[in-house]
């Protein structure tokens, strides 16, 4: 059975805790990717073209006998309109709102993906492969006192003491303007993910850590593959509270 050191708010060890069986799950990157992509696909907003886009013209064909293509042309000229190969014409097969863009995943596969992603958080090689910067040893298990933090400076102080604050700096410096049209569609910046803090129950810690770059706070019951493996890449730098470890016993089976 794997054990982990429990660290207090000062970063000092205050004992050990046995990790649940879920932390010994085999690494399944294929299922993790499948679960994350399924979650992303299932929250897509339906989209489609305007019903009469490209059709609002009185263009009509000249018919045969003129030595030109029999395509719809505007009435006061010879410019082609309406058809897909014409400038400003309709699309041949436009996207439709009724299209089903969801992706299904079996329940057992989904649970296995979450278990595998949880186990990946204590694999130092996988955590480093994601690009995270830290000086302490994984896994990180914090005393329940962290759930009582209500100010961002208190959270920063804890992360510095635990040797995790370098990853916050990495996430802050990694923010950059997105390439392409997305920058003018409400998603101008691409942001990095840093530390995930998993608590036993809802607390004010989520508000205290809300403004730290890339930090997410979630209860153990709200864990999913996307939180544990952003971008389908497992091994997120994760801080577990003592109560989260205790409450996890028997979950995700």
UniProtKB/Swiss-Prot annotation:
Supply one GO CC term from the record.
ribonucleoprotein complex
Instruction: Reply yes or no: does the keyword Metal-binding apply.
Output: no
Kindly list the GO molecular function terms attached to this UniProt entry.
rRNA binding; structural constituent of ribosome
Keyword Ribonucleoprotein in annotation: yes
Instruction: Identify the keywords attached in UniProt to this record, alphabetized.
Output: Ribonucleoprotein, Ribosomal protein, RNA-binding, rRNA-binding
**Which GO biological process categories is it annotated with?**
translation
Give a short account of what the protein does: One of the primary rRNA binding proteins, this protein initially binds near the 5'-end of the 23S rRNA. It is important during the early stages of 50S assembly. It makes multiple contacts with different domains of the 23S rRNA in the assembled 50S subunit and ribosome.
By sequence similarity, the record places it as follows: Belongs to the universal ribosomal protein uL4 family.
**Name of the protein in its database record:** Large ribosomal subunit protein uL4
């Amino acid at each position: 059975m794997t054990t982990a050191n429990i660290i207090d708010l000062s970063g000092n060890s205050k004992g050990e805790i046995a990790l649940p069986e879920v932390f010994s799950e085999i690494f399944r990157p294929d299922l993790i990717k499948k679960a994350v992509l399924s979650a992303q696909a299932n929250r897509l907003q339906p989209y489609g073209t305007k019903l009469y886009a490209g059709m609002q013209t009185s263009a009509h064909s000249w018919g045969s006998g003129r030595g030109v293509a029999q395509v719809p042309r505007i009435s006061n000229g010879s410019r082609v309109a309406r058809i897909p190969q014409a400038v400003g014409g309709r699309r041949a097969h436009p996207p439709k709102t009724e299209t089903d863009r969801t992706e299904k995943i079996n329940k057992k596969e989904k649970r296995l993906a979450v278990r595998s992603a949880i186990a990946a958080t204590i694999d130092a090689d996988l955590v480093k492969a994601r690009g995270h910067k830290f000086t302490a040893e994984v896994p990180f298990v914090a005393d329940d006192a962290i759930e009582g933090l209500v100010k961002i400076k208190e959270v920063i102080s804890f992360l510095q003491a635990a040797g995790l604050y370098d990853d916050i700096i990495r996430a802050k410096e990694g923010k950059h303007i997105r390439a392409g049209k997305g920058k003018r569609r409400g998603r101008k910046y691409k942001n990095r993910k840093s530390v995930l803090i998993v608590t036993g129950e809802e607390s004010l810690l989520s508000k205290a850590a809300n403004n730290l770059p890339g930090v997410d706070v979630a209860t153990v019951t709200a864990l999913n593959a996307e939180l544990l493996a952003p971008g389908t890449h497992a091994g997120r730098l994760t801080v577990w509270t003592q109560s989260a470890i205790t409450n996890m016993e028997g979950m995700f089976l």
